[in-house]
Amino acid sequence: MARLAVFTERYTIRSSVELTALTNFRLAAFELGHELDFVFKNELKYLAQYDAVLIRALTDPLNTAYVVARWAEMMGKRVLDTSESIRVCCDKVNMYRRLQRAAVPIPETRFLDEGQVTEAVAVRLFEELGTPLVLKAPNSSFSAYVDKVVAPEHFVRVGKRFLRRADRIVVQQYLPSAFDWRVITLHGKVLAVVEYRFAADRWKVMQRGAEGEAAITRGVPRDAAPPELLRVALAASAAVDDSLHGVDIKEIDGQYYVIEVNDNPTIAATEEDQANPEIYAEVIRYLAEGPSALAHLPG
């Protein structure tokens, strides 16, 4: 029997679907014969009592979640997410460069520092990559500080705003699609596959439609997912490390392009677990037993 801790924060349990997901992790642990407790920021001193830690809180190198990951690693405990995954995924420049080195297909991408955010550079990039362009701040999350620009003056205005948060920005080719694939992976294995279908006339999952409608999450059984989709997702995840990842992918004319690799991927009840309800047990098995517990999964 293993003693497992889930580090979370108060804001995480304000959402019913996330609270239910946390409960599902606990039920899965009990059914597998393990103990699982929720640990909050003011209870970190008790983490030494546990064998492994699952982080279900906002991750960033400046957040408590990163301290938890580093501490667990220094104590020799298994932890999700790893500190390496947090560092890489919270810096999109680092993440995209790793994907490029691993020859993972991504949209055409450029990195600009402050001196390059000019209308002249914008004109050249519109000619090279098309219109619109997507600008991203390196440390953005949940689609914040990610914007489309259609004119040089718009490019400069948004770029300079993003540079208040970082010393570089990411510029990418825009790939229009009706949905994004999300493949959740762990240690070279596929845990779940979903489609995030955008609201009408929207291009980001977090955007609501004109009538207030939200994006729709549709679960896809792992064995029904396109093999090339899974191959690309696993390659992208491996380019970061072997932690728990949510790989966002666009399908364009039968080709797959990685949009992002996310650490600490959302696992919400009735959404990411739709077609793969065993995801909770798989994560618990990994924490309690290690990578060998995932040998039966595709990957």
Model-found features: residue ranges?
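ATP-binding N-terminal substructure of ATP-dependent carboxylate-amine bond-forming enzymes
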Residues: M1-L80, E84-S85, V117, S292
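A short glycine-rich, hydrophobically flanked beta-strand micro-motif that places a catalytic Asp/Glu
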Residues: F38-F40, Q172-Q173, R182, D242-D253
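Short acidic active-site motifs
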Residues: N42, A120-A122, H154
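Short glycine-rich anion-binding loops that position phosphate/pyrophosphate groups of nucleotides
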Residues: L58-D60, N139-S140, N264
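A conserved helix-loop-beta module that forms one wall/lid of the active-site cleft
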Residues: A72-Y145
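Protein kinase-like catalytic core scaffold
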Residues: L133, K189-A192, H245, Y257-E260
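Phosphate-binding site of ATP-dependent enzymes
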Residues: A144-S237
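C-terminal active-site "lid" helix and adjoining low-complexity regulatory extension at the edge
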Residues: A238, E251-G299
